C-alpha cells in the first residue's frame, strides 16, 4: 500500500467518524402533519395550523437572503426552513449537514430581554440563523474537492472549525446590521462588558465559549463575540468580514484562524482583541454605588434574578451559580439565605396561599417542552395546570392568578381561579403582539402589564379587572418592561 493510499484511507475514516459524532439537536415532533411552502431560495415546512407563520417566515427569509447576498457569498442550493411550535421558549438553530436547514420555534421572546428590541423578532431570528448558513456553507479549494468526493460530511466545512464566539459574533453582527433590532442595538452586552471592565475582569479571547462556566456563561460567545466583530468591522471596514470568511473557507489548516484573520482584517485576532479590550477599559470610570446607601445582599455571582418580597425582612429570588442547578432562594436583609427548591429555569416565584407560585418548563413528550404553573409548600412541589403554556404568573391575596399564555408568534393574558379550576381570557393577542410581566396592584383591583404590538411599539398599561378598561401610562418604540407597584398602589 502506498503512502498516498494510506493517507486517503485515513482521511476517509476521519470523515466517516466525524459524520457519526455530530452534536445532537432538538428535532421538531415527528408525529405532526406537515405542509410545505416553496419560495425562490427556501423550502418552508410547517405543521398544520402554522401556515400563516410559514408564509410570514418565508417572506422574512427571502428578505434576509437578499440583504445577506449583498454582503457575503451565497450558499449552495435550496435552504430548508422549518417553523415549529414544539417548545415554550424563543430559539432557533441552523445546520449545514446533511443539507442547509434552519429550525425556528414560533414562541415570541417574552422572557429574553436581549431579543425584545425589534420591529420583527421573527425576522431577527431568521437573519441570525441564515447568517450561519451563509458563513458555514462557504467552502473553497481542497474542501470543495473533498465534498465533491465524500459529500457534505461535517468535517469538510472549514468555517465550522472556528470558535463559538466567532460564529455567533458574526451572526449577531448581521442580525443587528440588517434589521431594525438585534442584540448590538440592545444595551445588555455592553453593560456586561462595561461591568467586567469596571472590575478589571474582561475575559481573555480563549475564555469566550458557549460552554463557559464563568459569568455570563454561554452568553459570552454572543455578547463579547458580537462586540468584537463589530469592533473589527468599524476599524477594518465592513468588507473585511467577507474577506475573512472567504479566506477561512479555503485554508488548509482550518483551526489556524489567526492567519485568516490577517488576510481578512489585516491583523491577527489576538492583537485585535487586545486593542478591543483596551478600548472598553478606557471607556469606563471607577466603580461607584448606583444609589446612596447601596448594599449588596448576594455575593455568589452568576445569575440572581426576579426578587420578590415575602415580608418586610425577607425576599425570594431565582439563582443559578454556575455550580448547581437553578433554584429558588430565600434571603433575609442581613444576608442570610437558604435554598427553597430547584427550578427547571430561572423565573419569578411569588407568594401564594402560604407557598410560592412559579412557572417552569418540562417535557411533555420526547419532542415537546411546555410551561405550566406549580406551587411549592414545605419543600413539596405540586403542578397546578397541565398544557396551558403559562409563564410569568402573579397571585392576588385571595389566590386569583394572572399569567401569560404563550402561542405561536403571540402571548395573551389569562386570569385563573385554581380552586374552581376556572380561567378566563383577560387580553387576547394578534400575530406579533405580546402581553408580558403582569403584576397585581396591592389592593387586587388592577393589573400592570407590558404590552408590545406589531412594529415594536411598547406600552405600559394598567387594566382595571372589574371593567376591563386599560389606562396607558407610557408608550413608545423602546422597551418598557418589568412593571412594579409601590406599597401605596402607585
Predicted regions and their residues:
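N-terminal signal peptide c-region/cleavage motif recognized by signal peptidases
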Residues: 21-23
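Juxtacatalytic substrate-recognition/specificity segment
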Residues: 26-163, 211-214
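Beta/coil-rich, acidic/histidine-enriched accessory regions frequently appended to metallopeptidases
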Residues: 27-38, 216-219, 244-353, 359-362, ...
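Acidic/His/Gly-enriched intrinsically disordered linker/tail segments
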Residues: 28-30, 98-99, 114-125, 133, ...
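A flexible loop/linker signature enriched in serine peptidases of the S9 family
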Residues: 184, 300-304, 318-328, 341-346, ...
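A short beta-strand motif characteristic of beta-propeller blades
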Residues: 293-298, 336-341, 380-385, 422-428, ...
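Blade-terminus and WD-like Trp-Asp/Gly-His loop motifs, strongest in beta-propeller folds
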Residues: 306-314, 348-355, 392-400, 437-446, ...
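Short loop/turn segments that connect beta-strands within beta-propeller blades
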Residues: 332-335, 376-380, 417-421, 464-468
